[in-house]
Amino acid sequence: SAASDVYKRQAPVMMFEAPGMRLGLVTIHVPLRKVSDAITPDALANALRTTAAGLTADLGIPDPVIHVLGLNPHASEDGRIGDEDVVVVRPALERARTEGLRVAGPFPSDGYFARYRDRPPPDAVLALYHDQGLGPFKLWERGRGCQHTLGLSVPRTSCDHGTAYDIAGRAIADARSMTAAIRPPTR
């Protein structure tokens, strides 16, 4: 299929899943001072393609809707607070739309999750960097989420947290994220 052809050519996307939310990352473990340079039209377009193809191939969501968060406060306010959302994010979204993807944004990230808490969620939200998305996601999921890597030739899931060395061997770990990761990603 066309979706699987695109899926095999793109860089993987870390998708975090919990009941009521799927959140992907355009960049992963990039220092904050380097995030702006890492957000390019190609990087964002590739993440959008991989996310859309993965949602279709792995989760059976035809024609998924993807929301994209802005980089700067208030999604740059039309270039008044940095220009990345105007110069990089908007053109990448337009390009994705011309390819037939259903994308919207950039949305100001400071109020996005509160604003959409009581509305039907999109099929996925793309955060541009790690803490922009994972802070709100972890508040939302309360230990019930997992990480599902999109764009690989085999399914890959994991807990949505790090190694937790601080609690290792103390019998206090919460297994809900591991349980979510073990379930098939086609839920």
What are the language-model segments listed below?
Residues 1-84, 90-187:
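Anion-binding alpha/beta catalytic cores of soluble intermediary-metabolism enzymes, centered on
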